Swiss-Prot record:
The keyword Oxidoreductase does not apply. NCBIfam families: PRK05738.2-4, PRK05738.3-4. This is Large ribosomal subunit protein uL23c. It comes from Emiliania huxleyi. Part of the 50S ribosomal subunit. Its main location: plastid. GO terms for molecular function: rRNA binding; structural constituent of ribosome. Pfam families: Ribosomal_L23 (PF00276). Binds to 23S rRNA. GO terms for biological process: translation. GO terms for cellular component: chloroplast; ribonucleoprotein complex; ribosome. HAMAP family: Ribosomal_uL23_B. It is found in: Plastid, Chloroplast. Belongs to the universal ribosomal protein uL23 family.
Length: 99
């Protein structure tokens, strides 16, 4: 598990809003960028505590490191861990309602 000193806001960085995640919202699945060291259990407890919902499942994926070029310099885009959180049918997160 992730260290207990991290707060809930440190685990969940920001919501991910794309066309695909907009379709997933209709299926009651919400996507977040999370701390790379966070595990599924801590992500579940953080979402339940922050949004007062019941989480059914958590799926995670580590995105690969991507190289980006700016002029003649080659840099690296930071890696992100995505979490797709499935909620119980009677729950929803109002933060995503306007998306």
């Amino acid at each position: 598990m992730c260290t207990s000193s991290k707060s809930l806001l440190d685990l969940i960085k920001y919501p991910i809003l794309t066309e695909k995640t907009s379709r997933l919202i209709e299926q009651n699945q919400y996507s977040f960028a999370v701390d790379r060291k966070a595990d599924k259990i801590s992500i579940k407890s953080a979402v339940e505590a922050l949004f007062d919902v019941q989480v059914v499942a958590v799926n995670t994926a580590n995105q690969p490191l991507k190289k980006r070029r700016v002029g003649k310099f080659i840099g690296k885009k930071s890696r992100v861990k995505r979490a797709v959180v499935t909620l119980a049918p009677e729950n929803s997160i109002t933060f995503f309602e306007n998306a």
